[in-house]
Amino acid sequence: MKVEIYSIPNCTYCSKAKFLAEHSGKVHEVEYKMMGAHYSAADVRELFPTARTFPQIVVDDKPIGGYTELERLLNG
């Protein structure tokens, strides 16, 4: 499975999501994207119109939500 993590600086749950994805044994590719370096606020509004928190996570090209949803998917 491929996981894309859209993050912001100093985001604890963004870092936790990256660690979880990298160490789960279920993910073959992790892309960690930082706002400002890899995408803009406008991109977030377009990709995740209802999002209000970070990280925003995409699994195999499908937005799933945030850290809690990733944890549920990988550990459930």
Q: What label would you give each PLM region?
A:
Residues 1-28:
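Local sequence-structure signature of Cys/Sec-based thiol-disulfide redox active-site neighborhoods
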Residues 7, 27-41:
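Thiol-based oxidoreductase modules, predominantly thioredoxin-like and allied folds used
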Residues 12, 39, 65:
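Short alpha-helical
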Residues 41, 51, 67-70:
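A general structural signal for well-ordered alpha-helical segments in protein cores
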Residues 46-53:
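Thiol/disulfide oxidoreductase modules built on the thioredoxin-like
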Residues 59-76:
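Non-catalytic, surface beta->alpha helical segment in thiol-disulfide oxidoreductase systems
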